[in-house]
Amino acid sequence: MNTLLMHCRPGFEGEVCAEIAEHAATLEIPGYAKSKPASAHVEFVCQDADGAERLMRRLRFADLIFPRQWARGPGFIELPESQRIEVLLAELASYPVCGSLWLEVLDTNAGKEVSTFCRKFEKPLRAALVKAGRLQEDPALPRLLLTFRSGREVFVGLAEPRNSALWPMGIPRLKFPREAPSRSTLKLEEAWHQFIPRSEWDKRLAPDMLAVDLGAAPGGWTWQLVNREMRVTAVDNGPMAENLMYSGLVDHQKVDGYQYRPRQRVDWMVCDIVEKPARTGALIETWIGEGLCREAVVNLKLPMKQRYAEVRKILQRLRESFDARGLKVAIGCKQLYHDREEVTCHLRRLER
């Protein structure tokens, strides 16, 4: 199992290659990354047979920015037109018994076509794996991840459930709320799923908390905050959706989001303004560093070519700034499924 397969947003293969190559070099695990443009996946081929397993053991998947999902295996294998299950059972003879099964496809148009095959194939495959003793429901065992590039080509991979994506392919199935004024609302909801354990939502996303939404109009992110019954200051020169204003929980301030400062410390600051990432990074530094908020979810827009390098530079600058202030801040950064040319950062001040 010398190959690490990583899913990603189409067009961001280069960022995944740069990110995993840097980590592998730091960990002294030799190998090389390979990908094709807009293929929505990257393979990192390790020189050592156990290289992919060592990478997964030494890295926290949650700390990776651009990969949506990962799995280790020997690479893609060919399947015949018939007797696919028999071939897979033979391939799995050297694998450990697995505790769960996910059939995955790539986030491409071809992948959408393959998903129909996967839905039909999963039930008989699952039954065959259970009968052969290769699959038993146990969250402590590795997860079997079968990534189909077509009905005839599959990556037979493994990953630990606690150190891989929360959802198949890293894609959450969130329902767009009809009352929300824009689809951007799903970005904030996904961020909460990604960065906050569900068991902590009632405590950290509680009613009557104070929140500020910078660049709020028309209110996609504000809607999520109001839905949690928070009191929100929506900062934007543009108009807000009427249903949000009627809630009685929103104070609309028509000022520049980068200039606004709250009169008192708030629980949450969220920001989805289209601006250069360095300027937004400085905004994060001010709000968290000066204690204007306890937690923040902020999007960094990435129109430039060296996108991974830019994100890494901003995150490093934030860490150095907080260290210099003597602050303990948890920082997470991920390109979410609902993100486009951007990444989402989550920051939380931790009391020393």
Swiss-Prot record:
SUPFAM superfamilies: S-adenosyl-L-methionine-dependent methyltransferases. Its EC number is 2.1.1.186. Its main location: cytoplasm. Pfam families: FtsJ, RlmM_FDX, RLMM_N. The lineage of its organism: Bacteria, Pseudomonadati, Pseudomonadota, Gammaproteobacteria, Pseudomonadales. Transmembrane segments: none annotated. S-adenosyl-L-methionine binds at residues 184, 217-220, 236, 256, 272. This is Ribosomal RNA large subunit methyltransferase M. One of its GO terms (cellular component) is cytoplasm. Monomer. Signal peptide: none annotated. The gene is rlmM. It catalyses: cytidine(2498) in 23S rRNA + S-adenosyl-L-methionine = 2'-O-methylcytidine(2498) in 23S rRNA + S-adenosyl-L-homocysteine + H(+). The active site is at residue 301. GO terms for biological process: methylation; rRNA processing. Catalyzes the 2'-O-methylation at nucleotide C2498 in 23S rRNA. Keywords: Cytoplasm, Methyltransferase, rRNA processing, S-adenosyl-L-methionine, Transferase. HAMAP family: 23SrRNA_methyltr_M. GO terms for molecular function: S-adenosylmethionine-dependent methyltransferase activity. It comes from Pseudomonas aeruginosa (strain LESB58). It is found in: Cytoplasm. Belongs to the class I-like SAM-binding methyltransferase superfamily. RNA methyltransferase RlmE family. RlmM subfamily.
